[in-house]
């Protein structure tokens, strides 16, 4: 299984981080994932957010939307999925409060869900960067993840 390459991954996130503790948590994991890029896009209607996501996405990026109806994976399953995509560029997209526009969902390569629970998008961003770090350590055989 190939190692995770954070420089090939971009998180496209609707909205800014407003809570300092969330921003600190995201920064903590980003330091451990050199090259991981986070692009913040303006809150709007789902249709306008979809336009902004399409404009921000690079042509060669696989479009992965985080969505409540997406596929749920274990941390090991996510690591395996990301390891299989190690040579590809990824755009992991966190939508706004009203979710993703249906047309964007149709264009997505994959829909993933962090949980059956609903989270504020700020918290989803923190959980996503932590899971990316966890996936990286799983693929490297590091001690962070305990099965």
From Swiss-Prot:
One Pfam family this sequence matches: SPOUT_MTase
GO molecular function: rRNA (pseudouridine-N3-)-methyltransferase activity
Group of enzyme by EC: transferase
Reaction(s) the record says it catalyses: pseudouridine(1915) in 23S rRNA + S-adenosyl-L-methionine = N(3)-methylpseudouridine(1915) in 23S rRNA + S-adenosyl-L-homocysteine + H(+)
CDD domains per the UniProt record, alphabetical: RlmH-like
Record-listed S-adenosyl-L-methionine binding positions: 66, 95, 114-119
Cellular component per GO, a single term: cytoplasm
Domain of life of the native organism: Bacteria
Oligomer status and interactors: Homodimer.
UniProt protein name: Ribosomal RNA large subunit methyltransferase H
